[in-house]
C-alpha cells in the first residue's frame, strides 16, 4: 500500500525509479518562501469565508512562520520521499500543529499552488533584474559623462567606420538596457494575476474569495479562467525571452571588451579585479569575466528553448511535464543576474587607452564621410557624386600610404578642382565627432545632455522606489 498523500487508491508502492523521476524537491525547495506566503494567504481566506475556523487558521499561520524560520536558519530537513516543497511544508506543519494542518489544502490543488508559487518567484526575479539593470545603467551613464569627449573608432563589419566617443558608445548600451527593462516590466504586468483558487483545473465548490488572496499576495486580480490558470507557463517563457534578449546585449558588450583588451587592439584595459592569469604563461591577463558573460548567454537562451520544447505539445490542463519548468528557468535567471553584476563591475573598472583610441579613430580613412559631407554642403554636390569623388581621393591616399589629412591638397584637387584648403579642417577626428550634432549623434554636447537626462531619470526612479 502506498504511503503517499495521494495513495488512497493505490495498493503497491512506487518503483524506486518512479520515486527518482517524480521527485522535485531538489529544485522547488527554492520556492519555499513563496509557497509559505501563498499558504498563509489561503488559510486566512478560508477562515474569513467560514470554511475553516479562525483558531485553525491562526495555528496554521504560526506553524508556517515557524517553518519559514527553520528553512531560513538551515534547520529544516527536506525529505525526498515527500516529493516536493508543498508536501514537505505540509508534512512539517502536521508535525507542529497536528490534524489542523490537513485543513490547509481545502479548496486548493498542488496545480494552482505551484502555479502561484512560481508566479511569485518569477515576479521577484523580475523586480531584482530591473533593479540590477538600473545599477548597470547608472554605471554606464557615469562613465559616459566622464568620457563624453574621449574619441574612439566606431565600427561596422568590425572595420573602422567613423569616429565616435567612448561615452557615446557606452550610452548605446544604456538605451538597450532601457528596452530590456521595459520588456521585463511588461512581462510583470501580464504575470501579475493569481492562479490561487483555480484548484486542479475546474475551480472549487467551496465559497472561496480569490480576489482576497490575490490582493494579499500583491497580484492585480485573480486569473479569469481556472484551466488557463493551471495550464500555462507563458509568464516564464516571456520572462526568459526578455532575459535572452538582455543577455544577448550583455554578450555583445562582453565580446567588445574581449576584442578591445587584446594587445593587438589595445583600446581598453581591465584591472586585475576582472582578469585572471594562466597556469603556464606568466605574462597572461585574460578577460575571463567578459568571456564568461558571453558564455552565460547560452545558459539563458538554452533555458528559453528548453521550456518552449517542454510546453509545445501539452494539452490542457496540468501535465507532469510542467514539473520541468523550473530548473532551467532558475539557472537561466541566475546566469543573467550574475552576468549583469559582472558587466556592471567591468564598466566601473574599465580604463580606456585614450591615446590608442584617438590614433585608431583616425585609421582606415574614418573621416572620409566628413569630406563627402563638405563637398555636399560647400560645393552643393549631390551626395552620390560626393561619395564617388571622396572614394577616389581615399584611393589616392591609400596608394600613397598616407592618412587622408596628409594627402597634399593638389592631389585632392586633381580629382575635384573646387576643393579648397577649408576642406582639410573637417578631416580631424575631433572635428568629425563635434560635427555630429543631430539628435542621437555622437557630438560630446549630445552625449553629456543624454547622460545627464538619464542620471535624473534614474535618480527619480530610485526616489519613487
Swiss-Prot record:
* PROSITE patterns (alphabetical): FUMARATE_LYASES
Q: CDD domains from the entry?
A: Argininosuccinate_lyase (cd01359)
Please give the Gene Ontology molecular function terms for this protein: argininosuccinate lyase activity
Annotated GO biological process: arginine biosynthetic process via ornithine; L-arginine biosynthetic process
Location(s), subcellular: Cytoplasm
The domain of life for this entry's organism is Bacteria
Q: Does the keyword Cytoplasm apply?
A: yes
The main enzyme category here is lyase
Family statement:
Belongs to the lyase 1 family. Argininosuccinate lyase subfamily.
Q: What NCBIfam families does the database record attribute to this sequence? A: argH (TIGR00838)
Protein's name according to its UniProt entry: Argininosuccinate lyase
Write down the species. Rhodopseudomonas palustris (strain BisB5)
Amino acid at each position: 500500500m502506498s504511503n503517499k498523500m495521494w495513495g488512497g487508491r493505490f495498493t503497491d508502492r512506487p518503483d524506486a525509479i518512479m520515486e527518482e523521476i517524480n521527485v522535485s524537491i531538489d529544485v522547488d525547495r527554492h520556492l519555499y518562501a513563496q509557497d509559505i506566503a501563498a499558504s498563509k494567504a489561503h488559510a486566512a481566506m478560508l477562515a474569513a469565508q467560514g470554511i475553516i475556523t479562525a483558531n485553525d487558521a491562526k495555528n496554521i499561520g504560526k506553524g508556517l512562520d515557524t517553518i519559514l524560520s527553520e528553512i531560513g536558519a538551515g534547520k529544516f530537513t527536506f525529505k525526498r520521499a515527500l516529493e516536493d516543497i508543498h508536501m514537505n511544508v505540509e508534512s512539517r506543519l502536521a508535525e507542529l500543529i497536528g490534524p489542523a494542518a490537513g485543513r490547509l489544502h481545502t479548496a486548493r490543488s498542488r496545480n494552482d499552488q505551484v502555479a502561484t508559487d512560481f508566479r511569485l518567484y518569477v515576479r521577484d526575479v523580475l523586480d531584482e533584474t530591473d533593479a540590477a539593470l538600473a545599477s548597470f545603467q547608472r554605471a554606464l551613464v557615469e562613465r559616459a559623462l566622464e568620457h563624453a569627449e574621449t574619441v574612439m573608432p566606431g565600427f561596422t563589419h568590425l572595420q573602422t567606420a567613423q569616429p565616435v566617443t567612448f561615452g557615446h558608445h557606452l550610452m548605446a548600451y544604456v538605451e538597450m538596457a532601457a528596452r530590456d527593462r521595459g520588456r521585463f516590466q511588461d512581462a510583470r504586468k501580464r504575470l501579475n494575476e493569481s492562479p490561487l483558487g483555480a484548484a486542479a483545473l475546474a475551480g472549487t465548490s467551496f465559497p472561496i474569495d480569490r480576489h482576497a488572496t490575490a490582493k494579499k499576495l500583491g497580484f492585480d486580480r485573480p486569473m479569469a479562467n481556472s484551466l488557463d490558470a493551471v495550464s500555462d507557463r507563458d509568464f516564464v517563457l516571456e520572462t526568459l525571452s526578455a532575459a535572452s534578449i538582455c543577455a544577448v546585449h550583455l554578450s555583445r558588450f562582453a565580446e567588445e571588451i574581449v576584442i578591445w583588451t587584446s594587445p593587438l587592439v589595445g583600446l581598453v584595459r581591465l584591472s586585475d579585479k576582472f582578469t585572471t592569469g594562466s597556469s603556464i604563461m606568466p605574462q597572461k591577463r585574460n578577460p575571463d569575466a567578459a568571456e564568461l558573460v558571453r558564455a552565460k548567454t547560452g545558459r539563458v537562451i538554452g533555458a528559453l528553448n528548453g521550456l518552449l520544447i517542454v510546453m509545445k505539445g501539452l494539452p490542457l490542463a496540468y501535465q507532469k511535464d510542467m514539473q520541468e519548468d523550473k530548473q532551467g528557468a532558475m539557472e537561466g535567471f541566475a546566469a543573467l543576474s550574475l552576468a549583469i553584476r559582472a558587466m556592471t563591475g567591468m564598466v566601473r573598472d574599465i580604463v580606456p587607452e585614450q591615446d590608442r583610441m584617438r590614433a585608431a579613430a583616425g585609421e582606415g580613412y574614418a573621416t572620409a564621410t566628413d569630406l563627402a559631407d563638405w563637398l555636399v554642403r560647400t560645393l552643393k554636390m549631390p551626395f552620390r557624386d560626393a561619395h564617388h569623388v571622396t572614394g577616389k581621393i581615399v584611393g589616392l591616399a591609400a596608394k600613397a600610404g598616407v592618412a587622408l589629412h596628409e594627402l597634399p591638397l593638389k592631389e585632392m584637387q586633381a580629382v575635384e578642382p573646387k576643393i579648397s584648403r577649408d576642406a582639410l579642417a573637417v578631416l580631424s577626428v575631433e572635428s568629425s565627432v563635434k560635427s555630429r550634432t543631430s539628435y542621437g549623434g555622437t557630438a560630446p554636447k549630445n552625449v553629456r545632455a543624454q547622460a545627464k537626462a538619464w542620471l535624473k531619470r534614474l535618480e527619480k526612479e530610485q526616489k519613487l522606489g
